[in-house]
A protein has these predicted regions:
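Adenine nucleotide-associated cytosolic modules
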Residues: 1-319
């Protein structure tokens, strides 16, 4: 596992938890996040970057103390990007690993070849367009792609482990099955093209609400170029009702009335620390299963509901 590198694209509360778990397990991390620091992650829950450090209060306090001491060195310049801010903390977390590579370019400026060199790419807060591009580049090289986000008390992950991923199912103590492949397999781009009306299963007569909420965020971002928030909550509510009604499997009020939809819009960027920690632990375990080839992986959606504490899988497939 030590030879596998995991690339984190756009740090979030949940991806920082995944990073922490895997780095402590001895799996190298690289970060691709050229967003401005600290504004891009001002509200992100993270033990890596304490609020005082992100607000600049820590630096200001250090500078004031330094001014009192004659000949004291000047304070360090604040990192310009999220990647550069995270790097020293990741290195400190596990000094035995070979550093932490960073890429400070904006995601849209990073070539496909860069993503293809990592065993697993874990991404958050991406547009569907960029997620499809990165997933294709990663999986085409024989690697794995995971898109994961949390929103309020819920979280959702979409996993593309590739058509050739092999694993052995656990059959009992110290006993594994013959080599198996994921079946059915659906590429990430095709997952995004599955209509809402086809997102049903034996125990799900209608699309799961956690998944529907996440897809509504991605749908709104694809249409407007912006993530839902309090400022555009009314527009999100209108567009989401239309999107739901067009599915013809649920009504426009499936996720709630106008006020509920406006509240859902305000949660798109709201990351809750315990939710990030739990889902981050689950995804970290999925990464280890993917790397080792031991145990059956999730195929191809994971949903977490913080109200009941349940995390379950769901299969997106063509019908």
């Amino acid at each position: 596992m030590a030879s596998v590198g995991v690339l984190y694209v756009h740090m979030s509360g949940v991806s920082s938890e995944i990073l922490k778990n895997l780095v402590l397990a001895g799996i190298r991390a690289a970060i691709c996040d050229g967003r401005p620091y600290p504004s891009a992650i001002a509200s992100m829950p993270s033990s890596f970057l304490p609020p005082a450090e992100r607000s600049g209060a820590e630096n200001d306090s250090s500078a004031a103390d330094a001014d009192k001491e004659e000949g004291s060195p000047a304070k360090k310049a604040r990192p310009a990007t999220v990647a550069s801010a995270m790097q020293p903390h990741v290195v400190e977390l596990n000094p035995l690993l070979d550093g932490c590579e960073i890429n400070e370019s904006l995601v849209e400026d990073v070539p496909d070849e860069y993503f293809a060199q990592f065993g697993i790419v874990v991404a958050s807060h991406l547009s569907v367009e960029q997620a499809k591009r990165i997933a294709k580049a990663t999986v085409s090289a024989g690697n794995k792609f995971i898109l994961v986000d949390t929103f309020g008390l819920e979280g959702c992950a979409l996993l593309d482990l590739g058509p050739e991923h092999q694993f052995r199912k656990e059959m009992g103590k110290d006993k594994l099955s013959d080599v198996m492949k994921i079946d059915p397999y659906l590429p990430f781009a095709d997952m995004m093209d599955v209509p809402l009306s086809d997102m049903t299963a034996r125990w799900d007569k209608r699309p799961p609400k956690v998944l529907t909420t996440y897809l509504s965020y991605l749908e709104y971002q694809a249409k407007t170029g912006k993530w839902p928030d309090e400022e555009n909550a009314s527009d999100y509510a209108d567009k989401t009702k239309t999107w739901l009604a067009e599915s013809k499997i649920v009504g426009e009020d499936y996720l709630g009335d106008d006020e509920k939809l406006k509240h859902i819009a305000s949660l798109a960027d709201a990351e809750v620390s315990p939710v990030c920690a739990v889902l981050g632990g689950v995804i970290g375990n999925e990464c280890i299963k993917a790397i080792s080839g031991k145990a059956e992986p999730a195929n191809n959606v994971l949903m977490f509901d913080g109200v009941d504490g349940g995390c379950r899988t769901f299969l997106l497939k063509k019908k």
